[in-house]
Amino acid sequence: LKENYDVGFIQILDENFGSNKKHAYEVADILHKHNLLWFACGVRCTSTTNADIKYFKDRGCSALKYGVESGSQKILDVMEKVFTVDDVYKALDGCIEHNVFSPIAIMLGMPGENESTVEATGKFVGNIASKLGVHPKYLAWDIMWALPLPGTPLWEYGEQLGVIGKEDEDVVDYLTRVSDAGTYKRYYINLNGAPISEVLFWEYLVKFEASRTFHKLNNVNKELSEKYKKVTGGVIAVNPRNSLKYTALKFTQ
């Protein structure tokens, strides 16, 4: 690859990179031997230790992408991930410590998802962004949607709900639509039970909550807030009725 195509960077697409430590270390050694930078996509937070991350970093690893899925322990348990939110923080903190970029992937729309669990995920993303010192929009995080596939519990659940047909032609039609399509919103089948308008809003809610949490933790808007208070305070002092112009209602659950 290097000699014929001048390749200098390798992206590894794996289901669980690092679960076989011997294999992962050998891959890192080989890529380092050929002076290649690399990025492993598809890493489980409990499959890498702080020492592993350092080992990979020292051998040319520029990024590790963890399947975070959710910042809500409730949803992680529904997914049967068998790890905790703290486990995810530990892995990402290791990446931050060793200067390894870590884009994260989350998933919305699982059975049991609601505004509270979505907000928890948004807070999680905002916390990570705060640790890195960058706004969430620069994290390169992916928002996926729960997509049932044959042979999975999610598929069986969809059949039980009646949102996935059991006849052969129904299955063929569904698989034709989602084959190689990715877990994106336009292919989402509502397994949640909440109104679809509410479900689709969750994508915006998780982004809003991530941004709100980031600003709260970093207090980046403090200076602007103080200037705003001085300006609006002067206007209101001259004419108190102007304060009504900017009245806003809080969003509540």
What do the PLM-derived regions correspond to, one by one?
Residues 4-5, 34, 91-102, 128-136, ...:
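A structural motif corresponding to the C-terminal end of an alpha-helix
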Residues 91-94, 124, 144-145:
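Generic recognition of well-ordered alpha-helical segments
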